[in-house]
């Protein structure tokens, strides 16, 4: 275990008077050196916060899962089982089922390495007394598995790129896959022949060709997915059999939300979205109205700034945000990867 690290447990206050936006993010935690690239999060059965660290920023650090307790202790829980062909794992979206099994999007191809192309997996980790007992490959051969949610015994996974599916426009196609929770060794081809591919979208922004990413369900069973490059959130309605009835742009306002990375939903039905490129977090109400809640300039995150936010999660009455802090480019506020490695926090209200 990594030595315990203290975190700040108080909620950030509204700072509308000091800032044009409703809130200013605050520091939630400094992460140890074994977690230079924090990403997806999920709440464990015992209430701990589990953080996936694909560690793209430092490949000498094995991809791992961190555990954060309610009293502020941060420890390394375990390394994620690697794919033998590549020698690494790349955990991004994660989710627990009711039995306490952890499902992981192992986005092998994120780095762009040729040997990892179309080698992405969905893993199911089974535990006994908090120790890994069995690793099951639910699906393999995936191009870019990213976000993951569980509903009614099914796994819903976003694939941010499906480059083998060609749209006449030449624009990027991405989609949502659905697997049974008990599936094993599903061979994905990343084509329209995949029976598990339930819907696709096109990313229309030619400057940012990166597709479906964040994913969340509301209480009614509507599925919401973020089309990253377009800064749009789609609402997908399904029948009782899980067949897609509609897939429409539900919320879009690029003045408030430029890119849609990880997403979560609060008890009031508001969807919180990490605006990765803009160093911001937005909140979308039940009517689809988007409001930017907080934004940071290029920063190192040491003062609680949103240092390229990757995913939010509601935990213990706050919104915790992972700071990916790695990708640069013309559309990104972030200019470099740097220490410290952080999680930020926002108030729910």
Question: Where in the sequence are the language-model features?
Answer:
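Beta-propeller fold detector
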Residues: 26-29, 74-81, 133-140, 187-202, ...
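Short, solvent-exposed loop/turn segments at conserved positions within beta-propeller repeat blades
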Residues: 57-62, 109-120, 164-174, 228-231, ...
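Blade-level signature of beta-propeller repeat domains, shared across WD40, Kelch, NHL, RCC1
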Residues: 308-349
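Short loop/turn segments immediately following beta-strands, especially the blade-tip
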Residues: 125-130, 179-189, 236-243, 348-349
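Beta-rich, blade/repeat-based domains predominating
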Residues: 33-48, 55, 61-62, 82-102, ...
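Bacterial Sec-dependent signal peptides at the C-terminal "C-region" and cleavage site
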Residues: 3-19
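Residue-level marker for isolated small/hydroxyl-bearing positions within beta-strands
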Residues: 52-54, 105-107, 158-160, 226, ...
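A short helix->beta-strand "capping" segment at the edge of beta-propeller domains
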Residues: 16-35
